């Protein structure tokens, strides 16, 4: 897959993942987004996996944090022009965390169920770092997908938001890894 196609696919998957979060609250989209991101990054070089992670992050944060642009329109004459560059810059900067996560996953060269676990751990560590480094920015955590669902949300009391995110990403990627065990199902796995 060419780098341009990889980038656009990953960007679209990141944008799709936003619909799992409130106010849309469609966590059923997470296996599609993360399963496909796993397929885009497994077996790739660190550079290509990092690029896919960055593009996924840009799509995820650009659409997930677009509400920040509203603050620039309080005084639109003076600050309105800053809305698009500010949100785009924030998305591009925050996307460095998923980029690092996917590069670390690619570095592990792990596939199968172990690969799914490493993938989920890399993603969760990147969310934790994003939420704690410098002043922290714990917005748009994957665990927020369960905000409108009582039963899954209650597990956050035991494992926290980052632990719930880890379990969510792991359960999102596992079906694809299990389908990939049998080579003839690879094409089908791409559509899951």
Task: For the regions a language model picked out, list residue spans one by one.
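Membrane-embedded alpha-helical bundles of multi-pass enzymes
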Residues: 1-192
């Amino acid at each position: 897959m060419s780098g341009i196609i990889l980038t656009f696919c990953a960007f679209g998957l990141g944008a799709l993942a936003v619909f799992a979060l409130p106010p849309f609250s469609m966590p059923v989209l997470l296996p599609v987004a993360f399963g496909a991101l796993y397929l885009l990054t497994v077996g790739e070089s660190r550079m290509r996996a990092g690029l896919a992670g960055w593009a996924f992050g840009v799509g995820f944060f650009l659409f997930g944090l677009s509400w920040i642009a509203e603050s620039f329109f309080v005084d639109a004459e003076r600050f309105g022009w800053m809305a698009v560059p500010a949100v785009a810059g924030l998305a591009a900067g925050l996307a460095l965390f998923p980029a690092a996560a996917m590069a670390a996953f690619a570095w592990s060269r792990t596939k199968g169920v172990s690969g799914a676990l490493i993938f989920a751990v890399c993603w969760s560590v990147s969310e934790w770092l994003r939420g704690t480094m410098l002043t922290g920015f714990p917005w748009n955590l994957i665990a927020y997908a369960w905000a409108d669902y009582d039963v899954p949300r209650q597990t956050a009391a035991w494992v926290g938001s980052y632990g719930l995110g880890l379990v969510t990403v792991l359960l999102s990627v596992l079906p694809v890894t299990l389908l990939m065990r049998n080579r003839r199902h690879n094409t089908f796995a791409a559509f899951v």
